[in-house]
């Protein structure tokens, strides 16, 4: 007798061969390949994923499950004025954010004008560091900014600080480093090892692949870059005195979350698989810690209101993919600094997914999906092959200097099909409705130079792009 508790038990067994036979009748003279598609990155999409064709069982641990607060809602402040940046952070925390990142730029052109611990203290005034983790995005100033943050938090040794030094991303984006890039990695590791003694919960390095994504690279290139950066930083921390297991435990992976949420889901799951493989070989914790930031290359200036939907799709993909922290930015980021309204919309997009849609109530909800499992496996394999190429070239710094990374990014960019961008080259508005942005007065401060002794390093720069830019310029 059929088991009434299983719906499938009430139907005769189906096979892939029987399904394909029926499809052939429908297709007639057309080839079966007409049903096969590819993603924008060239990954194959099959019309059906029979259970027998799925990759093996899950090879990676997911993030620790917490149904009440499934991920860290993280915000970024880049307002040049320190006092205004402080107001933004406190407002975000009161509005539902869990943590914040301060982008530092002493010139005030691309971040908060901070040049000392005193400046940073003003930015973080009244923030309770034991409850609200604070992080940094400081480029080559990372080690100095990390010391500033450590000084600001000296009365809060239990604070979970995200120092997130990442000199390799700064090098890749700028195409040069003020002094040898190897010295910058060593300097960051030395500072990190010292701070690790005082802040046992601090995250020292951010091994981010987003610079590859923003320059037009594919998912495999982004994953390989992040993994290679993690290996470089772990080795540097070990040389600075940390045990291997602790070194890996102090590194966070940084990845981009795109509006193509299936790709985002698969990419984050593939990142966990790659991390587990590397960490297990080094006898470290195989559970990756991932910070997902919304892609900036997907944003449009024209009909920018659509960016809200793009951001929400990115947040959904990051959450379902298992990100530990999600930072969206705002829908006006392609135009200028956000208003309080734009910041609130960004927070609320995540809060609705978390509190109303209950996206985080299930651990790894995409597990078992043939499409997602196959894409996860394909991305992990492709990224692993590229990681081996990077390591064979001498590591990430050498691969950047040789042009290997830039060539891979350019090849991926050239192979990408023309995108369809709603409000730009598809369904443009009859009338543009401008968005409001902040236009602050210029602000800059004196700051120590990030330069280190020795000749500057150079590499082909990975310059950020926006997919909509060419279409907007043509109109």
Label each PLM-derived region with a short phrase.
Residues 201-234, 309, 315-316, 320-386:
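Mobile "lid/hinge" segments at catalytic clefts and subdomain interfaces of large enzymes
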Residues 15, 19-22, 42, 85-88, ...:
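General structural feature for long, well-ordered alpha-helical segments within catalytic domains
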